Amino acid sequence: MEKKKVVLAYSGGLDTSVAIKWLQEKNYDIIALCLDLGEGKDLAFVKEKALSVGAIKSYMIDVQEEFANEYALMAMQAHTLYEGKYPLVSALSRPLIAKKLVEIAEQEGATAVAHGCTGKGNDQVRFEVSIQALNPYLEVIAPVREWKWSREEEIAYAKENNVPIPINLDSPFSIDQNLWGRSNECGILEDPWAAPPEDAYEMTLALEDTPNKPEFVEIGFEAGVPTTLNGTAYPLSELIKTLNALAGKHGVGRIDHVENRLVGIKSREVYECPAAMTLITAHKELEDLTLVKEVAHFKPMIEQKITELIYNGLWFSPLKQALHAFLQETQKNVTGTVRVKLFKGHAIVEGRKSEYSLYDEKLATYTAQDEFNHDAAVGFISLFGLPTKVYSQVNQKKVEA
């Protein structure tokens, strides 16, 4: 019987390594796909590990710049903070992973793709909805969801099949990381009352260990895209990495969040997003300077919907594409520089400037240079308040009657 091909999203961890053996038993030839999203793994080792476990082919693709420009950038411009706190670290990477799975499957003539998600997380939804949107004819296999093993049973299976056991397997935490940040759950973090231990963090320093002097960074934007730090130009992926180090040193971007998952449960997670939180803060301030009032007040409603769509795995939905078009239109004049003070866990904007600034000091000042027409206020107030005045007059007459 001829074997079918499956492309597996491979991380190098226990679950996806065991999945290779499990899929082999189901008569599949496995093609492993590992993406470099800026998480800092030894990806050459991961690529070779897939082959040693049993994959017939192993891909390692650097997608850092694509992730930065096509995914993280939109999240920053839309100020995506799920439930007001979480900058969608993991949710942003899933549609890109799904896209690459489909591309390699089509290139290799595979009939299926596979992922290592469990049956109680959001990621299974994000992967499978994205894959269906890109190629509805591919079979999607979720080995971890299907085999329903305990951790002990999985380890026993790995030992029986000579699958290497990761040396960090005794770590209580489940970690996901990319350019945009780091998420951490499980272990002691499952108790929402327990304080996160310091070893739960990696990208940021504890406030007690941060410098006692602030550091200032000037972030330059061109049409809504961060392009420079302190006058030095960077590709977006490198700018994010550099800012992660700068802001992380000052403890910026630590988030402890109990969130409402798509699958109906609450989960407690700890996030580290130093660059993401700094960029979102700076970008919002530059928009305040350059967007007209109507757009500035309407845009948060669009941002909320974009955030929900991304969190819920609907990156490739028609609505998300339509809202992205609106978002891009708003960014044409978001050009300028924002000065941010990094200090003791805070990213504080202390200055902003733009050639497209709608702030006119001669209109805003209370000095002798004031050019605002104060006399125009009388007529404006009369017309602006007219509906309220008429309503009051009508209802007072009824009371008197």
From Swiss-Prot:
Keyword Nucleotide-binding found: yes
Keyword vocabulary terms for this entry: Amino-acid biosynthesis, Arginine biosynthesis, ATP-binding, Cytoplasm, Ligase, Nucleotide-binding
Residues holding L-citrulline: Y86, N122, R126, S174, S183, E259, Y271
GO BP field: argininosuccinate metabolic process; L-arginine biosynthetic process; urea cycle
Entry-linked InterPro entries: Arginosuc_syn_C, Arginosuc_syn_N, Arginosuc_synth, Arginosuc_synth_CS, Arginosuc_synth_type_1_subfam, AS_cat/multimer_dom_body, Rossmann-like_a/b/a_fold
Gene3D superfamilies: Argininosuccinate synthetase, chain A, domain 2 (3.90.1260.10), HUPs (3.40.50.620), Single helix bin (1.20.5.470)
Domain of life: Bacteria
Pathway given in the UniProt record: Amino-acid biosynthesis; L-arginine biosynthesis; L-arginine from L-ornithine and carbamoyl phosphate: step 2/3
One function term, GO molecular function aspect: ATP binding
EC number: 6.3.4.5
Signal peptide extent: none
Enzymatic reactions: L-citrulline + L-aspartate + ATP = 2-(N(omega)-L-arginino)succinate + AMP + diphosphate + H(+)
PROSITE patterns per UniProt: ARGININOSUCCIN_SYN_1, ARGININOSUCCIN_SYN_2
Residue numbers binding L-aspartate: T118, N122, D123
Compartment list: Cytoplasm
Residues involved in ATP binding: A9, Y10, S11, G12, G13, L14, D15, T16, S17, G116
Any one Gene Ontology cellular component term annotated for this protein: cytoplasm
Known partners and oligomeric status: Homotetramer.
PANTHER family linked: ARGININOSUCCINATE SYNTHASE (PTHR11587:SF2)
Family: Belongs to the argininosuccinate synthase family. Type 1 subfamily.
Protein name: Argininosuccinate synthase
